[in-house]
Curated annotation (Swiss-Prot):
(6R)-10-formyltetrahydrofolate binds at K162, L187, K188, L189, I190, N204, D247. The active site is at H206 (proton donor). It is found in: Plastid, Chloroplast. Its EC number is 2.1.2.2. The gene is PUR3. One of its GO terms (molecular function) is phosphoribosylglycinamide formyltransferase activity. Gene3D superfamilies: Formyl transferase, N-terminal domain (3.40.50.170). It comes from Vigna unguiculata. This is Phosphoribosylglycinamide formyltransferase, chloroplastic. N(1)-(5-phospho-beta-D-ribosyl)glycinamide binds at G109, S110, N111, E276.
Length: 312
């Protein structure tokens, strides 16, 4: 079978290349990590060199967040005698393991709650395994304890002797086998030790359309007051990768919210927060499904679940 020929080129060992069922049936395979196209030169051409009527790859997508993996979509080309309606698609897809998430909060943690609820309902292919906070009695920490999620105090403070140092925090998150770090209203600057340990795996949500109204001092209601005072007609949440500075990492997703003529900061904040809850869950779903891809110019994109050639 042509599909078996393709898979055997990825998985030369018989244990990694199981028998594939009828091509009209969907199938899922575990592939070894593919770190670059150069590892598999035959992938550099869309036509894999099989004769007419064989399977030809039509899409290759490199996943660059945490563990590298590939998804391959194949279609059976028609011979000169084949009827068009006999064409069909075959999809060989990497099996994605369930991800482990660490969430950082400083307050009530409404975004944290939305993510946790999505995980419990099954719409999110990951679990919040640990909560990190700089305020041990904040609402987010209380919610975590009530739901059996371990709570870690960071950073270490004079009045909080149980707090961790940056290196201790990195070691602790590694013990929890954390895949992604999600900042959800966490007001402390993330230490460089953590950024280096979890490269391209730390995300933050900010209540404005970055790069506008971001940076040190722009948080909470201060952001919405500044947006209204500026006369801006639109605002909305931004989710971005975290670097060594406040709100300067690569933008991953945004959602536009109109600023109404007579808006108060509280009214605008409520509408933006509603969009935050939806957007963060959608982005974390994409992270857990390994649907983040990188453009050649370094811009991250979220791949559509339904169509790998479309981006959200």
């Amino acid at each position: 079978m042509e599909a078996q020929q393709i898979i055997s080129r990825f998985c030369p060992k018989s244990s990694l290349a199981p028998s594939i069922p009828m091509v009209k049936q969907p199938f899922s395979l575990n592939f070894p990590p593919l770190h670059s196209l150069s590892s598999y030169p035959f992938l550099q051409s869309q036509n894999l060199g099989f004769p007419t009527g064989a399977l030809h790859a039509i899409s290759f997508v490199h996943k660059e967040v945490c563990s590298s993996s590939w998804r391959i979509w194949c279609s059976k080309s028609s011979s000169s005698t084949a009827e068009p309606e006999e064409d069909h698609e075959v999809r060989a897809q990497v099996t994605v393991r369930r991800k482990k998430l660490a969430v950082f909060v400083s307050g009530g943690g409404s975004n944290f709650r939305s993510i946790h609820e999505a995980s419990k309902k099954g719409s999110l292919h990951g679990d919040v395994t640990v909560l990190v906070t700089n305020k041990s009695e904040c609402g987010g920490a209380q919610y975590a304890r009530n739901n059996g999620i371990p709570v870690i105090l960071f950073p270490k403070a004079k009045d909080e002797p149980k707090g961790l140092s940056p290196c201790d925090l990195v070691d602790t998150l590694r013990k929890f086998e954390v895949d992604f770090v999600l900042l959800a209203g966490y007001l402390k600057l993330i230490p460089v030790e953590l950024i280096r340990a979890f490269e391209r795996s730390i995300f933050n949500i900010h209540p404005s359309l970055l790069p506008a109204f971001g940076g040190k001092g722009y948080y909470g209601m201060k952001v919405h007051k500044a947006v209204i005072a500026s006369g801006a007609r639109f605002s909305g949440p931004t989710i971005h990768f975290v670097d060594e500075h406040y709100d300067t990492g690569r933008i991953l997703a945004q959602r536009v919210v109109p600023v109404l003529a007579n808006d108060t900061a509280e009214e605008l904040a409520a509408r933006v927060l509603n969009e935050e809850h939806q957007l963060y869950v959608e982005v974390v779903e994409a992270l857990c499904e390994e649907r983040i891809v990188w453009r050649k110019d370094g811009v991250p994109l979220i791949q559509s679940r339904e169509n790998p050639n479309e981006f959200l």
